UniProtKB/Swiss-Prot annotation:
GO molecular function, one term: calmodulin binding
Residue stretches in coiled coil: none
Biased composition (Gly residues): 1-15
Main location: membrane
Native species: Mus musculus (Mouse)
Keyword Cell membrane: yes
Record function comment: May regulate basal voltage-dependent L-type Ca(2+) currents and be required for beta-adrenergic augmentation of Ca(2+) influx in cardiomyocytes, thereby regulating increases in heart rate and contractile force. May play an important role in cardiac antiarrhythmia via the strong suppression of voltage-dependent L-type Ca(2+) currents. Regulates voltage-gated L-type calcium channel subunit alpha-1C trafficking to the cell membrane. Inhibits cardiac hypertrophy through the calmodulin-dependent kinase II (CaMKII) pathway. Inhibits phosphorylation and activation of CAMK2D.
UniProt feature, compositional bias: Low complexity: 57-82
Protein name as it appears in the record: GTP-binding protein RAD
PANTHER family: GTP-BINDING PROTEIN RAD (PTHR45775:SF3), RAD, GEM/KIR FAMILY MEMBER 2, ISOFORM C (PTHR45775)
Subcellular location: Cell membrane
Region Disordered, annotated ranges: 1-86
Effect recorded for S26A: Reduces amplitude of peak Ca(2+) current induced in ventricular and atrial cardiomyocytes by nonselective beta-adrenoreceptor agonist isoproterenol; however, basal electrophysiological properties of Ca(2+) channels did not differ
Residues that bear Omega-N-methylarginine: R24
Amino acid sequence: MTLNGGSGASGSRGAGGRERDRRRGSTPWGPAPPLHRRSMPVDERDLQAALAPGSLATTAAGTRTQGQRLDWPEGSSDSLSSGGSGSEEGVYKVLLLGAPGVGKSALARIFGGIEDGPEAEAAGHTYDRSITVDGEEASLLVYDIWEEDGGCWLPGHCMAMGDAYVIVYSITDKGSFEKASELRVQLRRARQTDDVPIILVGNKSDLVRSREVSVDEGRACAVVFDCKFIETSAALHHNVQALFEGVVRQIRLRRDSKEDNARRQAGTRRRESLGKKAKRFLGRIVARNSRKMAFRAKSKSCHDLSVL
């Protein structure tokens, strides 16, 4: 499995190709850095070695031709990261997974601010962007992952490196929906002990007449596999901003939840009283008898990316 795009093409480009690599950015920090096009690393250390020191947050994002900047709608604060602007610890790695042709690359390019066209392929397929969500800035490093012919779907290093996973299918392709379910199973097996955000995305929601996967099917799948759900349209840019902002919120919610749980456990190590034990036991019985109600409640919240 590799990131879309290869490194061999850069050496054969002439002066025109090198000029495209130095396309003028539209941010106040000056020109964007040169493109980084590379294969999927064996592990995360190889990825870090492939980049210049301090440049983990300065990959292909922000590289575009003049007039092709695709901003979030007005009212959302965002900026493209400049060289060395963020530390490695402050970057969230997000992997886009899914069958070929479901629109992963289109979603990634919208996030990176790059418009589809003849120049789009030159921009690489790893995108970095800093966005402000709920008044707090976050840097996302988005990988557009694709399957090589005869390759396995998700190698171990891919499973281990993500801070969040976005599994994309097309609502017009039932097979891609089934493949998305397979990917979710693989992730669950690989990271059973990790509470990693996984978001199921039904793309191409604008193609209503060609729909093969209903909203209810997508939502039910998300509930069964314990992940979030959203439908998007890359063609109309519908819900794309909500998707990536939701990724940030899900990462933060899990981070904050772990910190709260640690504090709670540290402060409640004293022995429980008999009344508390009885209450906890009764709570378990009620929970067993309320599975259907819990399933309904979960199905109502699985599309809300602002809650766990």
